[in-house]
């Protein structure tokens, strides 16, 4: 649970701000072992270009290099064509597997926008 957003919250760069141009892109694995309770995930997506949409979701795995599956409740709203979107979702880390990644699927052409996902989390022993 996020008790103190000031001094007790840590930022998780699930997907650092990066160009989302074609296909499906996946972020690096984030280890949730040191965190507990709700994690707020914030999506910041800029307009991607005419007809371009971004479908962003969180995926999870028991091992860093394992097979990743969708996190229950971990999908953001798909952006409208050529529209920016900022959105926040909450997922409880106790309900997720140890490792998470972000997945961005670009549809409708070659994107020209940037997409980032940041998590705000509380450590177990802080």
Where do the protein language model's features map onto the residues?
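Compositionally biased, intrinsically disordered low-complexity segments
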Residues: 17, 74, 92-94
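Surface-exposed ligand/attachment interfaces on beta-rich extracellular proteins
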Residues: 17-34, 46-70, 77-85, 105-112
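Noncatalytic modules at the cell exterior or secretory-pathway interfaces
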Residues: 37-43, 93-111
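C-terminal interaction-tip segments
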Residues: 1-13, 106-126
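Intrinsically disordered, low-complexity boundary segments flanking structured domains
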Residues: 1-2, 75-78
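Aromatic- and Gly/Pro-enriched, solvent-exposed loop/edge beta-strand patches characteristic
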Residues: 81-98
């Amino acid at each position: 649970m996020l008790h103190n957003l000031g001094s007790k919250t840590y930022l998780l760069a699930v997907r650092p701000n990066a160009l989302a141009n074609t296909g499906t892109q996946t972020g690096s694995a984030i280890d949730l072992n040191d965190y507990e309770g709700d994690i707020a995930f914030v999506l910041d997506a800029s307009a991607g270009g005419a007809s371009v949409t971004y479908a962003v979701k969180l995926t999870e795995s028991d091992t860093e290099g394992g097979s990743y599956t969708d996190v229950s409740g971990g999908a953001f709203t798909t952006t409208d064509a050529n529209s920016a979107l900022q959105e926040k979702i909450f997922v409880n880390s106790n309900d997720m597997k140890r490792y998470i990644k972000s997945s961005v699927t670009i549809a409708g052409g070659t994107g020209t926008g940037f997409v980032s996902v940041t998590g705000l989390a509380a450590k177990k022993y802080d």
